[in-house]
A protein has these predicted regions:
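Glycine-rich His-Gly loop
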Residues: 46, 138, 208-214, 290
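Active-site-proximal cap/loop segments of hydrolase catalytic domains
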Residues: 231, 237-342
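Alpha/beta-hydrolase fold active-site loops
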Residues: 187, 204, 283
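Short coil/turn segments that connect the beta-strands within blades of beta-propeller domains
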Residues: 39, 85-86, 130-131
């Protein structure tokens, strides 16, 4: 139960039994990933910025207080790092789309790895003694494939995960839009449907959201959605506040006292789908699982007129009593406790 990405990597010398472990960082340093190259360790942290930065410090004498900033925060959210012989590979989020970049050792700026489609590019493996990296690439309309990136930054499909007969339907399209919420925040909304779907308000539509723990809903192909899409259904995914699509700031804007933003964002996305004639309130359903039950449950009680169906899949609907359940205590950091007023 519970969720959190912060880590505390320790250090000890290989081949010297009894060597004391050295703590490189604490959870307060907000480090979520790290990579090692030579005598240096690179730390991905959201301490300097809610959109993350990469710091470098010495393995011999780690000191985050004097660590050098190798990659500064930008509009994109850094999500993962990996060290290879030719450079430091960076996984970053540009809205719902994930990209991979390479910062050659000694260079100031990272170059984007060119991939055949936009979707979710994720680092899988890299080694400081081998050039290049292995990554996966998936999209809303295409299943995951494995690519090898060479030291020159060229990506080649390894064919290690070949597409099946139904893994890349040519009749599906995905559109990325941003929807204005109740307070002006722009919420990323991904809309997937058949290319011949008519925008006449008649399409059955399922709107999915989660909005907790800073978890982002990124592009991914779901074969179980094919029957829905083939029958002219529309599937939409909203990265409401509480997700990590724009980093820690976006996450904290849908957290505890700001939690109402999550369902108000979902309501705004539902209204957008209706206004743009994808569907109507008589044919619109919303789906949220686990913590997403709070999202869809409160959207339902606030705007019952807007939805024809609500699916809380193993959904949390009673946040007040949730901490008394077997899995309740680990989730107190996310939702708070009835024993303490905040």
């Amino acid at each position: 139960g519970g969720d959190g990405r912060e880590t505390e990597p320790p250090l000890a010398t290989v081949g010297k039994p009894g060597t004391p472990w050295v703590k490189i960082c604490d959870r307060a340093d907000k480090v979520t990933d790290f990579a090692v190259k030579g005598d240096d360790i690179y730390l991905l942290t959201h301490a300097p910025s809610p959109r993350y930065a990469v710091l470098r410090t010495s393995l011999a004498k780690p000191d985050l207080g004097s660590a050098a900033a190798v990659v500064a925060a930008s509009d994109q959210v850094l999500f993962a790092i990996a060290a290879a012989r030719d450079g430091l590979y960076l996984e970053s989020r540009d809205g719902a789309v994930k990209r991979v970049k390479r910062l050659a050792w000694g260079a100031k700026d990272a170059a984007e790895v060119k991939l055949p489609i936009e979707g979710a590019a994720s680092l899988m493996s890299a080694s400081p003694v081998i050039g290049g990296a292995i990554l996966s690439l998936a999209a809303w309309t295409r299943a995951r494939e494995i690519f090898a990136v060479d030291a020159a930054g060229e990506a080649v499909n390894t064919k290690l995960q070949p597409l099946g007969a139904f893994d890349a339907p040519d009749r599906l399209v995905a559109t990325e839009v941003k929807v204005k919420s109740h307070d002006g925040a722009m919420v990323p909304l991904s809309i997937i449907h058949r290319s011949d779907v008519k925008l006449d308000g008649s399409n059955p539509t399922l709107l999915y959201g989660y909005g907790a723990y800073g978890i982002t809903e990124e592009p991914g192909f779901g074969p179980t959605r094919l029957a829905w899409l083939e029958k002219s259904g529309v599937y939409a995914v909203a990265n409401v506040r509480g997700s990590g699509v724009y980093g820690q700031e976006w996450y904290k804007a849908g957290y505890k006292a700001t939690k109402p933003n999550t369902w108000k964002d979902l309501i705004a996305c539902a209204e957008y789908l209706i206004a743009q004639k994808y569907t109507s309130n008589a044919k619109l359903g919303i789906l949220g699982g686990s913590a997403g039950g709070i999202l869809v449950g409160r959207a339902m009680t606030e705007r019952p007129d807007l939805f024809a169906a609500v699916i809380p899949a193993v959904g949390v609907l009673d946040a007040i009593r949730a901490e008394t359940t077997a899995n309740g205590v680990p989730n107190i950091p996310e939702f708070g406790t009835v024993k303490k007023e905040e």
